[in-house]
């Protein structure tokens, strides 16, 4: 059963029938996590790097920002039984789609914020596909952790994390 993760949204599951999917990651970033022992996975689709840009929005929806969404994703996975030392991580998105001149560089700023958060928390990113000017879609199957990424113009590829 597909569970769609929208923009500024997050889902975590331990149901082996679930497949988490987020579509059209442009400048946004998708973070997929999976604990292969507990068979718990989660997917976050955030828009902006820092909640300090709009603290009131971050309070209403922490999944909008990297610095509030990523910790919330991990916390939700831990509550279901995932362990930090076993978690595998896939990061995708961070493209420069609309802002071709690079004035805002939201995609690049999102990527930098993501890498900083993972580095600061001693979490390794197992697979990273970011930048460029293409949209990406991520799927995460909870039963086995199979992760696939569809990239505009490049087709779909499976990412083996276990």
How would you name each of these model-derived features?
Residues 1-162:
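Active-site microenvironment for binding and transforming phosphate-containing groups
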